[in-house]
Amino acid sequence: MADVAKGGNRRCVTVTKGCDLALNVADQLGDKVREGKMRLVDLTHTLDHNSPYWPEEASGNPFHTSIATTYQKDGNFTRNLSLPEHSGTHMDAPVHFDPKGESVDRIAVGKLFAPAVVIDVSSAAKSNVDYRVTVKDIEEWVGRYGEIPCGAVVFFRTGWDERWPSQEKYMNADTDGVLHFPGLSVEAAGYLIEHARPVGIGIDTASVDSGRSADCAVHNLTMPAGVYHLENVANLDRLPATGFSVIALPLKLGGGSGAPARVMALIPAEPEIHH
């Protein structure tokens, strides 16, 4: 599948050539937001000591802060911060599972601003916490809304963000320590790479792989294809299925396997009706 994703496709604009264009478009979109022609939706959870974390990566909460300066002593307030790269709403860079992949600081700016869609599987996930998105889910979405734009970020809404910020409910570990939350099937991920060539995949759970996945098959398939992931995304229920754009801005950490990110959706405002 990775070869297909890296191969030519005349329907797709080369993403890496879009950096300057993306910056120009961002300026234009800023004007539209100020003029009320577009609205912004924040897709980012607040990152603090209450944020859920991967239990196997730390014996306790890995988010730590300490006071560096104070108003009383220094005339200003700053903190020192220690946390894993994959904390809160964050981006997984391709190098996370591909030794030859891009680190988070090397992802082209043009890939951070993209068209986006939301595929809603929340009904299925509500009845099955281990639900994995299927090819059928994607095909049904395409049948209803049309083709997924090439070079898009494809979000999957499972409804899991309703459990944030409870560590117990969000990570949902059983008595054996196995996590239980929805994700993608490897077949669905392969379908996306072959048919849509997305720049990114986003989800409102802790991982694009389901919680009980033992081999991270979706990561291992998509990251060699250059696809980044946005995980722990918020507010997907506030987005339309299609017709909007996303801006994903991770910390530019040198060599980073990922980084916390501010993720925002830009949605065209509904036109006013004049009588």
Model-identified regions with their sequence ranges:
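Active-/binding-site microenvironments in catalytic and ligand-binding cores
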Residues: 7-275
